[in-house]
């Protein structure tokens, strides 16, 4: 892109490119629609371990998928934020797609080599302004405290490599805020206080954290959007003078399972973020533009041999779009547009 949205001082708004249905038509239409309602696309792909362990350059389906996403984004004048994801997005306690005989640890030299090469490939091919090296890493650190330091050392190595080639790249990891803020009951983590964030997990990455980025899906915690405390997100700004970002998140608008939420709750959620973090955010991702058809996704996941529990978990996120499955706007879309 000739001019990057990230050159301006105002917040950039974006989405993760999950189409309402798993079809090519749905994908092409989504990129057109994201260009109307956003500035960038979140490119958050897992690691092609077997390809990247062999070197920075190479050809594989996963690499091609990323190239195609960026091509579509640029055709629609959308910028991109990259997050490289070693973990299973629906269960961040585990790696995603690691070859069967590989040790599941960030101490594994093959894991480290592949992840480094992936980062360098992205930097050299796409020159991203924002490069995330993990998503919701605190959930992995909680589950595997003995491996946390191995990941942090890998992060610092990649940070130095990328800065040597592209010093303007802003490098970060994301933290799952609702978990960091201790609003889920997790007795296995000891006597942590609700609304008292585990800052030590964030600060373990300093001084090499260029952005403090969070994800948040508070409908898992609060009965309504109005229940989000007025100081739920603002502690971030009291703790750091670094730029902050909302790297993914959403609020469900439909009653399902144990949830009883409505479109008004989604409006309250957007307003809470805007009021509490507002102009301090360099970018803000509402994970979905459109709700998605969970049957279409479950079928695709089954064909890939994914764990059926992953499809059930994914269903919890089906109604966080700013528009319904067919593109009908929800009340929150006008609120989102008013912020932009």
Which residue stretches match the model-derived regions?
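Alpha-helical scaffolding within the catalytic cores
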Residues: 22-31, 64-68, 115-119, 181-204, ...
């Amino acid at each position: 892109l000739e001019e990057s949205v990230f050159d301006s001082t105002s917040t950039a708004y974006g989405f993760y490119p999950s189409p309402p249905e798993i079809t090519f038509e749905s994908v092409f239409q989504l990129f057109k629609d994201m260009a109307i309602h956003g500035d960038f696309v979140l490119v958050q792909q897992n690691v092609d371990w077997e390809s990247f362990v062999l070197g920075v350059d190479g050809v594989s389906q996963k690499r091609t998928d990323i190239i195609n996403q960026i091509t579509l984004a640029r055709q629609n004048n959308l910028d991109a934020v990259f997050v490289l994801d070693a973990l299973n997005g629906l269960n961040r306690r585990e790696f995603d797609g690691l070859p069967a005989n590989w040790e599941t640890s960030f101490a594994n030299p093959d894991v480290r080599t592949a992840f480094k090469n992936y980062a360098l490939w992205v930097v050299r091919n796409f020159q991203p302004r924002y490069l995330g090296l993990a998503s919701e890493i605190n959930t992995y650190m909680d589950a595997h405290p003995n491996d946390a330091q191995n990941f942090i050392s890998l992060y610092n190595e990649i940070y130095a490599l990328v800065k040597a080639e592209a010093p303007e790249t802003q490098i970060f990891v994301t933290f799952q805020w609702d978990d960091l803020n201790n609003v889920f009951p997790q007795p296995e983590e000891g006597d942590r206080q609700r609304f008292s964030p585990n800052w030590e997990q964030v600060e373990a990455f300093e001084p090499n954290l260029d952005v403090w980025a969070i994800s948040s899906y508070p409908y898992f915690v609060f009965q309504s959007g109005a229940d989000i405390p007025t100081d739920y997100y603002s502690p971030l700004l009291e703790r750091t003078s670094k730029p902050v970002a909302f790297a993914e998140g959403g609020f469900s608008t439909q009653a399902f399972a144990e949830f009883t939420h409505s479109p008004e709750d989604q409006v309250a959620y957007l307003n809470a973020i805007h009021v509490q973090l507002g102009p301090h955010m360099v970018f803000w991702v509402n994970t979905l533009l459109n709700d998605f058809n969970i049957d279409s996704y479950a079928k695709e996941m089954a064909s890939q041999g994914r764990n059926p529990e992953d499809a059930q978990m994914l269903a919890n996120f089906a109604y966080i779009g700013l528009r319904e499955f067919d593109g009908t706007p929800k009340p929150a879309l006008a609120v989102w547009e008013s912020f932009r």
